[in-house]
Amino acid sequence: MALRFPSFSQGLAQDPTTRRIWFGIATAHDFESHDDITEERLYQNIFASHFGQLAIIFLWTSGNLFHVAWQGNFETWVQDPLHVRPIAHAIWDPHFGQPAVEAFTRGGALGPVNIAYSGVYQWWYTIGLRTNGDLYTGAIFLLILSTISLIAGWLHLQPKWKPSVSWFKNAESRLNHHLSGLFGVSSLAWTGHLVHVAIPGSRGEYVRWNNLLGILPHPEGLGPFFTGQWNLYAQNPDSNNHIFGTPQGAGTAILTLLGGFHPQTQSLWLTDIAHHHLAIAFIFLVAGHMYRTNFGIGHSIKDLLEVHTPPGGRLGRGHKGLYDTINNSIHFQLGLALASLGVITSLVAQHMYSLPAYAFIAQDFTTQAALYTHHQYIAGFIMTGAFAHGAIFFIRDYNPEQNKDNVLARMLDHKEAIISHLSWASLFLGFHTLGLYVHNDVMLAFGTPEKQILIEPIFAQWIQSAHGKTSYGFDILLSSTNSPAFNAGRSIWLPGWLNAVNENSNSLFLTIGPGDFLVHHAIALGLHTTTLILVKGALDARGSKLMPDKKDFGYSFPCDGPGRGGTCDISAWDAFYLAVFWMLNTIGWVTFYWHWKHITLWQGNISQFNESSTYLMGWLRDYLWLNSSQLINGYNPFGMNSLSVWAWMFLFGHLVWATGFMFLISWRGYWQELIETLAWAHERTPLANLIRWRDKPVALSIVQARLVGLAHFSVGYIFTYAAFLIASTSGKFG
């Protein structure tokens, strides 16, 4: 008999019900729970799957390049980046006939196309690509990398090439190689590309392999490097009237500290970016030589941690035992990696609009909105995942003996204080913020807007002033024309920074008022509540006062049977599940705030945001309703327009979102009864009863139904907002 799915669990494979399929899918990636798994095979499988992941990423990015080269308008866009709309790819079969064909034929294309809102055109242009041939070359290169990654993944599953467990647990060597190799060498290589290809490209020189050695990136060549006259590389930067991509107004500097933005492209100076990557490369190349491996020099991480015991004994045994705890737990390592990556992704969202690195991307408003929202949602999912794996670590990998009285054990010992403080912060933020919004809402409703409680964010304004923003009149630090820092800044470091902070044509240090103060605290409420749920889930994962033996039930369990009250909905998985709703809710507020403030800035009517954002009806009426009007009008008696597809997606997103509640609110008994009724009717109906299931149909478990509900809620929520965001922005600004 052929092996039934799932092959990794014989117990499940023999299950006579549809549970087999659902539990099989749910545990497919939980390698630790598979039959015949060993620590060695676990590490090897994960290692090999990383190569598969890389192969998919390279294939996907190769596809982006290939489709733009084949069906896009990159060469036309390069001629006029501000007025030509970049094409992502063609649409094969636009539905709804000729009106659809006409609506979607744009950007100078001959047929219907999708417009790119990903920023790839600006990125490729900035790094020196100019022709479709360049894009094809990049696509082929990435396809080759993808193939190599696949082969490497397969190779490392062959007996001869399987690394040993000791190799995986050699933390010092891995850190050295990742710091020096991944970050150091790749940053140095990127600096090389910027200096040799991108910067000459921005000055009208087309550098490729055939002329790479013939064109000096700097007139002096390597002379200043070897003679220690490094300042020569910063002299004669591009002038303020430099036209990007041409020699007009171009300088010769390659590594600068100008600060601020290129006046024409409104993006960071390429020579500043090259300098930044060179500095990063230097730091990480040094960092990659810090840890002790074969040569007996450098630090041993274990020794560092063992020695790291705070004086006075106030933190117990400090970091003793942590090295082995972390090094032997994949979940702990994954939790740390996800936490770091989540924070970095959110920082990317922030910096891509406030300090745009790619030429002309700041003037492509829809792309700016899409990239900000995209990176914030990604960050939210990654950060919640960090806590999920932290909780799994406590259940599966934590050893109380090994961690006696160290900082980790002490976190568990005083978890009540941590959880109650977070709870207090969340309650305080929630009641006060909502109280202010509701008060203001009532005042507007009663026709007395002057009775609103409007609080100026003076501390935040003071911080902005300290960094050089003069409009508030604080006259402090960098905003004080008499301070030594201000005077040094004019000449020594970042002379363009202070100009950029005080120009109104960018998103650096936007002017803030009472509306910003309120929404800031609403977001703080969301962040603290999400964190409360996640932290409580992880710290209570092993047990709580109500259920001291919780760890024996695993990561996700619905209840401990009907006979034990209070054990439902308190697994670590349930905490993750609840936190994701709060995470989505919080990022909703973040993106609403970002988008509305920027729409009014771009349209030149910032007073709309300032006046309407201080009360709830303002957000509902002047942001959500006003900006969804075009979506609600996507199909009308006059035919269709280029926003129709977003209007459809807006409706479809709501449908998917609402479907989530079918799984989230109705419980298992209802479904089991319904399924049995349907199966009974099916078996007694002629023709229909010729078809039999191999598996007896049963309802999803409570935990699985929650997962399916959460997935629909999340996907529908994001789909709906994506359509709203792109349509409302592109409808206004093209």
UniProtKB/Swiss-Prot annotation:
The keyword Membrane applies. Chlorophyll a B3 binds at residues 662, 670. It is found in: Plastid, Chloroplast thylakoid membrane. It catalyses: reduced [plastocyanin] + hnu + oxidized [2Fe-2S]-[ferredoxin] = oxidized [plastocyanin] + reduced [2Fe-2S]-[ferredoxin]. It is a multi-pass membrane protein. The keyword rRNA-binding does not apply. SUPFAM superfamilies: Photosystem I subunits PsaA/PsaB. Disulfide bonds: none annotated. Keywords: 4Fe-4S, Chlorophyll, Chloroplast, Chromophore, Electron transport, Iron, Iron-sulfur, Magnesium, Membrane, Metal-binding, Oxidoreductase, Photosynthesis, Photosystem I, Plastid, Thylakoid, Transmembrane, Transmembrane helix, Transport. InterPro entries: PSI_PsaA/B, PSI_PsaA/B_CS, PSI_PsaA/B_sf, PSI_PsaB. Phylloquinone binds at residue 671. GO terms for cellular component: chloroplast thylakoid membrane; photosystem I. Pfam families: PsaA_PsaB. PROSITE patterns: PHOTOSYSTEM_I_PSAAB. One of its GO terms (biological process) is photosynthesis. Its EC number is 1.97.1.12. GO terms for molecular function: 4 iron, 4 sulfur cluster binding; chlorophyll binding; electron transfer activity; magnesium ion binding; oxidoreductase activity. Chlorophyll a B1 binds at residue 654. PsaA and PsaB bind P700, the primary electron donor of photosystem I (PSI), as well as the electron acceptors A0, A1 and FX. PSI is a plastocyanin-ferredoxin oxidoreductase, converting photonic excitation into a charge separation, which transfers an electron from the donor P700 chlorophyll pair to the spectroscopically characterized acceptors A0, A1, FX, FA and FB in turn. Oxidized P700 is reduced on the lumenal side of the thylakoid membrane by plastocyanin. The PsaA/B heterodimer binds the P700 chlorophyll special pair and subsequent electron acceptors. PSI consists of a core antenna complex that captures photons, and an electron transfer chain that converts photonic excitation into a charge separation. The eukaryotic PSI reaction center is composed of at least 11 subunits. HAMAP family: PSI_PsaB (MF_00482). PANTHER family: OUTER MEMBRANE PROTEIN, OMPA-RELATED, PHOTOSYSTEM I P700 CHLOROPHYLL A APOPROTEIN A1-RELATED. This is Photosystem I P700 chlorophyll a apoprotein A2. It comes from Phaseolus vulgaris (Kidney bean). The gene is psaB.
